Design a protein with these regions (language model features):
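Negatively charged, low-complexity tracts enriched in Asp/Glu with abundant Ser/Thr
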Residues: 1-15
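Charged, amphipathic alpha-helical segments
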Residues: 18-26
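Short aromatic-glycine-(Arg/Gly/Cys) micro-motifs in beta-strand/loop hairpins
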Residues: 25-53
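A short, charged, amphipathic alpha-helix used as a generic interaction element across diverse proteins
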Residues: 58-73
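Mixed-charge, Lys/Arg-rich low-complexity intrinsically disordered regions
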Residues: 72-122
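Preference for solvent-exposed, low-hydrophobicity sequence contexts
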Residues: 109-115, 133-135, 151-191
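Short beta-strand-centered aromatic/proline hotspots
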Residues: 113-150
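Non-Sec secretion/translocation targeting segments of pathogen effectors
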Residues: 192-206
Length: 206
């Protein structure tokens, strides 16, 4: 049986992770007056959780209203981000297996453009701008590796992140990438090479 999610002394009775926000609605029947219900944001920091902008009330409808407003705001934020990406790059549809080359256990994917499997992303992130990555290393990038983690740089916005090898749908050759992704690939490789360089070389480059 799955353990019930809690936030401190509160039991989570509803939650929604939308965009960049994890929003929870909680109840504590033993709480002091005025604090029976709670709504807050949850952030994961390493192995710990941090609770932000907590509001409490004995009025369930009031807290549900806050919960709904926060979900709506988070959804609006990610809609705006997606619309901006669509405007900048044009076609931003989810990349499927038909559009990339599958990888095997024998393949190295280091310095390859990898496609994150949309089924491993939340629905609002199933777009090419969130899937195309340069794999820069990690034990999971090696052939026949027992490791899983692959370090990646997003070709759309340059953010650095990591995925498991099992999250990767396949690879795409650079010449098959759309123009925006080719530009992002060049920038990602330049940044990676700069970060690899000894400190002295970095200083001279500046």
């Amino acid at each position: 049986m799955e353990a019930k999610r809690t936030v401190g002394d509160y039991s989570v009775i509803n939650s929604m992770y939308i965009g960049h926000r994890d929003i929870v609605l909680c109840e504590n029947t033993a709480a002091k007056k005025g604090e029976k219900y709670l709504c807050c944001y949850v952030e994961n920091v390493a192995v710990f959780e941090r609770y932000l902008e907590a509001l409490v009330s004995d009025d369930f409808a009031e807290i549900v209203k806050v919960f709904g407003e926060r979900v709506s705001e988070a959804a609006a934020e990610i809609i705006k981000e997606t619309e901006q990406a669509n405007k900048e790059i044009g076609s931003n549809e989810e990349i499927t297996a038909k559009k990339c080359k599958a990888i095997s256990y024998d393949d190295s994917i280091k310095d390859k453009v990898v496609v994150i499997d949309g089924s491993h992303l939340r629905p609002e992130f199933r777009h090419a701008s969130r899937q195309l990555m340069l794999c820069t290393g990690g034990f999971g990038s090696d052939p026949h590796s027992r490791g899983r983690t692959c370090f990646c740089t997003c070709l759309y916005d340059g953010r650095q992140t990591s995925y498991y090898r099992s999250d990767i749908l396949g690879i795409i050759e650079p010449e098959e990438l759309p123009e925006w992704a080719q530009k992002g690939l060049q920038e990602a490789r330049e940044k990676y090479e700069q970060e690899k360089a000894p400190n002295k070389e970095r200083g001279e480059a500046r």
